[in-house]
């Protein structure tokens, strides 16, 4: 496990439903001394698609073995050692 920074891009998809209600009042200045009161409400549905980029800090597993497309590669010396051990065990 190694703690390190990650950087990359991403795509996001979102959906939301919301309702709101508000009440407000206001007072007009000179020369309009008028008091106003208002109320309102509304509902909405939203759908969105977005992209972004950023960094994060976390942990991930890192192996010291050399791999190519998921196949672990070993050195020739290591392979010869394994073959020699197999031949000793079979006799």
From Swiss-Prot:
It comes from the Eukaryota. The keyword Cell membrane does not apply. It is a multi-pass membrane protein. It is found in: Plastid, Chloroplast membrane. The chain crosses the membrane at residues 8-28, 34-54. GO terms for molecular function: lipid transporter activity. Signal peptide: none annotated. Interacts with TGD1, TGD2, TGD3 and TGD4. Facilitates lipid transfer from the outer to the inner plastid envelope by bridging TGD4 with the TGD1,2,3 transport complex. Required for endoplasmic reticulum-to-plastid lipid trafficking as part of the eukaryotic pathway of thylakoid lipid assembly. This is Protein TRIGALACTOSYLDIACYLGLYCEROL 5, chloroplastic. It comes from Arabidopsis thaliana. The gene is TGD5.
